[in-house]
Amino acid sequence: LSSSSAASDVYKRQVMNYIKYLADARLINMVYPKGEEFPKKPSKLMMHNTNLMYSIYPVKVEEQDVLDTFFMNTLYKDHKLYKGDKGTSFMVDNGLHFRICAEGCKFKNNPNVYYALHKLELGHGNMIPLWLFGFLY
């Protein structure tokens, strides 16, 4: 690669185009902060679904990444997901804040945030079992 800024800019655009092709092929999802979109750099790249995570590199699959991917995969068809603010995982549509929590996750209950909790059987208040989102798929 050339060290000139023009060549560097072309390279960045090519990489972003390749990432967009992967997203269009439904292999990855790009998560942006509210108000940003392609061709800007996404704040987070995620596999499109959890099966792809285990097929590409099954040795190092983090539980939190699996939970986040599951949540995003169940909602992305009908909703727009953005990077969440501090203390949240995602912002859905225009203001529903969700935090995805693994079993045993410690958090202060914020009434403005919905908590999707792994291994919770029955929901109450703003705490929703993560498995229920699977019915949206």
Language-model region placement:
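Short, well-ordered alpha-helix to beta-strand connector turns
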Residues: 7, 94, 110-112
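Conserved catalytic cores of phosphodiester-cleaving nucleases, focusing on short active-site segments
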Residues: 71, 75, 88-104
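A short, terminal or domain-edge coil/loop segment
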Residues: 83-91, 130-137
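Accessory nucleic acid-recognition modules appended to NTPase machines
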Residues: 4-87
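Long, low-complexity, charge-rich intrinsically disordered regions
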Residues: 100-137
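Generic signature of intrinsically disordered, low-complexity segments enriched in small/polar residues
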Residues: 14, 21-24, 93, 117-118, ...
